[in-house]
Amino acid sequence: IRDYYASRGLGDVYKRQLKDLLETIRIAKQNDKIAGIYIESGLLSSGSASLEAIRRSLIDFKESGKFVVAYADNFTQGNYFLCSVADKVFLNPQGILELTGLASQTLFYKGLMDKVGIEMQIFKVGTYKGAVEPFMLDKLSEANREQIQSYISTIWDNITEGIAESRGISVNDINHYANEGLFFADPVKTVECGFIDELKYKPEVEAY
């Protein structure tokens, strides 16, 4: 399965709808002529919900006893979360693994609108209604900060727990490595810490 998300919108031959990919994995599980799945992962641009759906489908595929092998020149945080479910995860010896956690940034327009003389007419009901805040405030309200933090934490917890279960690494260690951002500097560290099985070039993986 080559990463069709990497070139989404560019007319690439591997472009598919999510439901088609999930159906393909389901059929592959039942097809006795298919021994396993090889994931060649590029730079994912998919959302967390789609990644989770594909990942769950791959977990279901593995219940058949068939293998899943993953390779990337570079792993973004999203595609590593997906590929961590594989039996073997390979990284290019010159590659990086991005694992830096999640963050959210909000742009505020009130100052600009004040300068150009634009006055917004806003009707806001309820505490946790943050959509209009960029037009009426110059920073996050505590309520909006709370709900954004809750949303991000839920996604991050799902990522770390999934990786921990698949790779046998504790959630605490994953959070530590993410905070340190070590993997940008040294791909060997990804193997030492258990995130990557081996550093191999693409032809070596294809011959695996």
Predicted regions mapped to residue ranges:
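Membrane-embedded segments
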Residues: 17-88
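Charged, glycine-interspersed solvent-exposed loop segments at helix/strand-loop junctions
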Residues: 110-187, 191-208
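Generic non-transmembrane alpha-helix signal with a bias for helix starts/N-cap capping motifs
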Residues: 21, 54, 76, 106, ...
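Residues within well-ordered alpha-helices
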Residues: 1, 24, 57, 79, ...
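Flexible, acidic/glycine-enriched loop-and-adjacent beta/alpha segments
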Residues: 69, 73-129, 198-208
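Second-shell loop/turn segments in exported
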Residues: 15, 40-48, 67-73, 95-100, ...
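Single conserved hydrophobic/aromatic residue that forms the stacking wall/gate
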Residues: 1-14
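Extracytoplasmic
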Residues: 32-36, 49, 63, 75-78, ...
